[in-house]
């Protein structure tokens, strides 16, 4: 592991990170063509007094693809791995359950991964031509309001999790394939096509715009949950937008504004969110 007050990496070629990088004061910046984190974490923990809401604690700028290769696991409040657990959906929300008693949620358990970007309560900014999150984490949860901004010029595959206590904004010019996008405040996504396998959740109230605000140009395939726990869901897009809500799909919110050329619903649509 490498620990320093600030970590700044810049290369015209590719960057491969296979050991943890920890910035304790001024954050982390990475500029490269492609970047891969293989079972390694980039961690930024600037003191709260020095943190600036407009300055990312982790700032990634790539002309190519960001790839995270890791293993999801569950952890306690101190980051220690909890064995014998898995992630399930309950009323549209991801919960960590005991594999021996699948109906029992494990109290105080948190999602984690051995690969990813961690900036507790601080902003994370990612600009890249592509994203492949294979079991990794992009995480700015904590006691503050750190937000996450993603600007992806092509496709984005999120088979890990992306989570923040602040606003999560993602613009994807290609197809977004998602497992878990989680915001304790607002979630705003703009993409060409959306394939949601598990959870896209916004747990905060509306703040002038709907808490869960989705703009999809062409097609939505939902086999998981689109959940606004305390606010509204807005789902709009191009003139030919097609929405398919599969049998396992949930669209749950306190009010829905859905406009599409075609809507095929075999799942659940509800204007009152669970919880």
Q: Model-found features: residue ranges?
A:
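Low-complexity, glycine- and small/polar-enriched segments
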Residues: 1-275
